[in-house]
């Protein structure tokens, strides 16, 4: 979250599931409600579960500051444990949705 804050990244993209075939593949780095990560407070304010992906909205702020930022996490949940998605339309729809939140002049998208 420190990197997200430092780089002013408004979009985070995740294309792996936390657990695949019963094995942990990725650390769940986001809170379900609110948590402190070093000097950054992260609060989840909204979650939208869709067929192939989830969009989570977070508000982040420095522990001692007044600057508040919104961060959207796009989590593609339909990637199979092995191989690639059977239909490219699923991932293409996901990419279009991610790009719809990107605007010129903002920080980078974090993957």
Curated annotation (Swiss-Prot):
Output the InterPro entries linked to this UniProt entry: Prot-tyrosine_phosphatase-like (IPR029021), Protein-Tyr_Phosphatase (IPR050348), PTP_cat (IPR000242)
**Catalytic activity line of the entry:** O-phospho-L-tyrosyl-[protein] + H2O = L-tyrosyl-[protein] + phosphate
- E.C. code: 3.1.3.48
PROSITE patterns this protein is in? TYR_PHOSPHATASE_PTP (PS50055)
In the UniProt record, the signal sequence range is: none
The UniProt record lists the keyword Hydrolase: yes
Give the binding site residues for substrate.
81
Domain named Tyrosine-protein phosphatase: residues = 1-111
Keywords in alphabetical order, please: Hydrolase, Protein phosphatase
Q: Which family does it belong to?
A: Belongs to the protein-tyrosine phosphatase family.
Name of the protein in its database record: Tyrosine-protein phosphatase 9
Q: Which organism was this protein described from?
A: Styela plicata
* Organism placement in taxonomy: Eukaryota, Metazoa, Chordata, Tunicata, Ascidiacea
